[in-house]
Amino acid sequence: TGLEKKKENKSAPLLFNLAELQNECSRLFKISPDETLRITQELYEKKLVTYPRTDARVLSTAVAKEIYKNINGLRGYEPAAGYAAEILSGGSYKTIAKTKYTNDKQITDHYAIIPTGQTGAVRGLSAIALKVYDTIVKRFLAIFYPPAVYQKVAIIMKKDTESLFSSFKVLISEGYLKVAGIPASQNRGNKNNDDETEDVKCDAAMLELLQKLKKGDIIQAGEFFVKEGKTSPPKRYNSGSLILAMENAGQLIEDEELRAQIKGSGIGTSATRAEILKKLIDKGYIRLNGKTQIITPTLLGEMIYDVVAASIKYLLDPTLTASWEKGLTGVADSSISSREYLDKLEGYVTRRTLAVKQVNNQYMLRPYFDYAASFYK
């Protein structure tokens, strides 16, 4: 009763900033953000990649104009030589400044992490450092390739009074996927948890059959069955995804004005987020599984959370950070003076500190501690 056919383009992702690289390396290689930063710093010192402590995921206009040098240099790195030559031959690098991968407004101090094109020190890299370097190279080269193209076919069928829906998707042109190291058969990022239906991957033969369908055709049904499932709780953070959550902490703020203030800053900076996690681990507040990189709270961590939540809950709300950022913005644009801002800040801290000193909630907290402890036996 219904038939829709359309093509869908999927462009290469933006370049790596430090948080994205830490997340990717945690996922692919099961290494901690601290280790990723250490390795990337080593690559930088060996002049293999650009400055690592950056929040930007794009190129500057000035760098885009000279990007030929970076690509041409990668012809000396055997795994990327063919791709680099293909890009130079096709000339796609000449227009990169006009794409979403170049944006001066999205850069504060440093542009995205990219290979420099100097490859002399590659031979001396450890196995894991070489993997990180290769990941950066592939992400960089991918932006010069066309989008991957998918063919989608959505079908609405009717049996008596019941309507049945099916959606099929097949890759017809791999585009950037061939350099990104993602197999054509792997359909990453195509699931949408908000959708009631999910695209079914199919091969070329199945696609050809679907392409011949016309509205009104009668389809022979082999069998009907009910597929049951359960909703799952959100996945636990790993070391990489927690870094991204810190970077984007403001997304949970409902107030649009305050959310805008914290956008682009979040918790910590690209240079300090890994160290913040390391400090929490060293103090015994959270635990890191070295093999899976999954992060879980400790009993001590949960108890501290309960104390803060009961005593000064505002410290757990990203809105507080956003309001402070708003004040700093006011100082920067001269809508308020630095003295006025500091007076308000000092007054707030003083009032909250005095309030906490007067709190006597030890007995109220005991049930929370006992409940948390029951999960750590």
Identify the residue ranges that each predicted region occupies.
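Metal- or metallocofactor-binding catalytic centers and their adjacent structured scaffolds
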Residues: 1-14, 22
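Basic, low-complexity terminal or inter-domain segments flanking catalytic cores
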Residues: 4, 8, 33-34, 52-377
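A conserved hydrophobic secondary-structure block that centers on an alpha-helix together
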Residues: 28-36
